[in-house]
Amino acid sequence: ADRFNAKRTVSACFLLHAVALCLMSVDASVSRIPALCGVFLQAASMAFVFPPLFKVFAQCFSADEQPILLSLTMPLAGLISAGGIPFFIGYCGEYYTFGLAFLTIAAMSVASAVSVAYLKNRE
């Protein structure tokens, strides 16, 4: 994140996450290799995103705003990742396909990657 722009690094991690989810959406009857690669890339992309994400927080929000931001976003992220997303994947798996769930979440990751560009640095 220091050599590259932190926002670019966060966007690249989100795009890598989207690619991983697209690989995970490949039907296992076709091949299991894309899904296995997707699982590895998905875990790696989320591990890589946190250091530059906190740097972006520091660049875009003042020291007074950062505790409020983190105290609001971290519980919300936990609710979404531990409740909303698994529910959505299960719902799609039950009524549609798991691939649809992974592709939808990949689209959300692409939207997140694009939205990072609109964060303004504090002055």
Across the structure, where does each feature detected by a protein language model lie?
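Cytoplasmic membrane-interface "Motif A"-like loop-to-helix N-cap segments
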Residues: 2-14
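Alpha-helical transmembrane segments of multi-pass secondary-active solute transporters
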Residues: 9, 69, 92, 100-105
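C-terminal ends and interior cores of transmembrane alpha-helices
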Residues: 15-29
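MFS-fold secondary transporters
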Residues: 23-27, 42, 116
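Hydrophobic core of transmembrane alpha-helices in multi-pass small-molecule transporters
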Residues: 32-48
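Intracellular juxtamembrane helix-capping segments at the cytosolic ends
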Residues: 48-61
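A late C-terminal transmembrane helix in Major Facilitator Superfamily
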Residues: 60-96
